[in-house]
Amino acid sequence: SRSSAASDVYKRQMYHSERGVYEHKMGIVEGGKSALLASCGPMGLGAISYMLNCNRKPSLLVITDIDEVRLKRASELFTEEYAKERGVEIHFVNTAKVDDPVKTLRDLTGGTGFDDVSVYAPVRPVIEMADEILGFDGCLNFFAGPVDPKLSAMFNFFDVHYKMHHLVGSSGGNTDDMKECLKLAGEGRLDPAVMITHIGGIDAQIDTILNLPKIPGGKKLMYLGKNLELTAIEDFEEKGKTDDRFKELAKITKEHNGLWSKEAEDYLLANF
């Protein structure tokens, strides 16, 4: 799962060290300053949820994207109050709407830069922005898997040498990470539902797979024992005008902050 991959990255792949001490301290800086760039897609939402609910948290978490709709949705799912209850100060920034994104982001750290920065889109400007907002001993995690074998970006090697900047990549989580995320989900601390935006049945599966790059939103949850066209959760209310079952699903999801839930699933399995 995306959350288990985040678990692997933030506990075991990212690392820090001290001058003169040749030992890596694995994981993000506990109580440090973290940024997740281009992180309001399904993969990023899973990471935000993990960062706010795991045992090793930053004190500052900054989320960026250039899609205002996705950014707004993320801020509704992970409110300032929600983060504060977990000991984290959270900010959401649309980097397309500020004159100087690098300065804007660095200012949120008090000018020190970030200890840990993760990139959730394989896009050169985002990678280079991540490099520019790193602080001393900053770790840049290139989480997004690229499809272009020639993807490259500028990286400041002066800062590598003198400021101990370093770079890691993610290859996903392992069985232990999956176990941790299942445990957190079972305890109610991690909610995978934040990544789900559509539901469908077996009859919708082929078209959904073939057209996946063209379908907006996050994860598509398919119920193979049901015949059901692919439907966005946000469209339940409209479909409910002609189908009482979707009217009820709209009511249930509203009660769960617009998210899919066990209650919604139970209703679907019993009524579709």
Label for each model-derived stretch:
Residues 40, 48, 52-127:
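Adenosine-nucleotide cofactor-binding segment
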Residues 54, 132-136:
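Conserved helix-to-beta-strand junction in the class I
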Residues 1-6, 10:
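Single conserved hydrophobic/aromatic residue that forms the stacking wall/gate
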Residues 20-34:
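Short helix-loop-beta connector
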Residues 144-164:
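Rossmann-fold NAD(P)-binding glycine/threonine-rich loop
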Residues 14, 21, 99-104, 128-132, ...:
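C-terminal hydrophobic helical "lid"/dimerization subdomain
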Residues 43:
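Hydrophobic/small residue at the entry helix of a nucleotide-binding pocket
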Residues 59, 138-139:
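Glycine-centered, small-residue-biased loops immediately flanking beta-strands
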